[in-house]
């Protein structure tokens, strides 16, 4: 396996590397796995293994030219994430073999589904790169929306049918609710999903407003298609409360109602715009903007990039010692490269202490370090905060006392995918569980993992 263009200043190019390749082939190598780029930094690695927001299959033309000059089969991997692109590369004679590493991490049954002519059921790779970054942050190549990858021993890729069919309600159509409904339907249960809004996807619908993260739509689209295939009754524009659910004859209710932006509880916090409103376009802001990130995910990075691209002068502030502490190296490097080019200023180790509104309509933001009395200030046209979410748990809270399990999740069963059999209230007519951000502020992967673990036990 070797690169045929290091794509860097003073790096080796196709001519030199073809000579190296020919020497290797003369030494007895039977197949060449040809790549583009180099791997000596996170940023350069994203050129070899492009991530979300970057072009698909960017090196096909280069590798096609290389193939014509070699007398052994040539394989290539480089964000060839879908079957049509792979098929084209083979049929057009550009490649002899296609490497689809991340696509197989997302769906190990991809080859089987091609053979069975069920390509429409392939779980798509969305390029989030949780798999690659996860090797270094979590010690395993997890997939953002396949919770079984990396956990096959306790959470197999296949879902066993339930011994007895049940009538189950899922409340909420975000990532957690969609995965819950899919898992329950795969087990053979009768499933009804209630979503208060007019579309499925939850917070993904906000995230995809950033051009860099549009591929996340694949998480929603695949599950929506699977729910249709599996016969799940999806009810949009359907707000349901505890009384609606408790009297509907369900055997189990899974609450996946998500969360709402967490309020910034500081003096003058009412002057802060919520990140969701700005990302969704509901609120517009220009001029000098301070973004306060006390969450550490990609949300503040999306905010900074979008606002800076629209002409705002942006300062991104975090109380942490590093920016975006929960974002992996490959993803972070792509954002930081863009933000640096846009002139975004980065400030670490600063808490947003208080805010004052000035007579001219601007705001003074007072920053300081944790437990320190001194302050420094910024005068800006607007302040946006990203602080995670607060669980929306009203429906769950009201159902707990009516349920047979008292809302309890058996931890050992959760870990190993066993049945949830806890009985705390013998008079209860149904079980109730909550998953995803309805428990606490986390992310897409955690929400889907919750759903997979809990619902396999129902």
Task: Cite the ranges covered by each PLM segment.
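A structural motif corresponding to the C-terminal end of an alpha-helix
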Residues: 26-30, 65-73, 223-235, 342-345, ...
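Local beta-strand N-terminus motif with an aromatic residue
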Residues: 29, 95, 250-251, 380-381
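Flavin-dependent oxidoreductase catalytic cores
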Residues: 1-171, 175, 179-186, 190-191, ...
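Rossmann-like dinucleotide-binding cores of NAD(P)H-dependent redox enzymes
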Residues: 190-230, 297-352
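Short beta-alpha connecting loops at secondary-structure transitions
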Residues: 45-52, 96-97, 204-212, 433-440
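Short, hydrophobic/aromatic-rich segments at coil-to-beta transitions
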Residues: 359-365
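Generic beta-strand/beta-sheet core signal
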Residues: 1-3, 34-37, 77, 92, ...
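Rossmann-like dinucleotide/flavin-binding elements
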Residues: 162-196, 200, 236-249, 256-329, ...
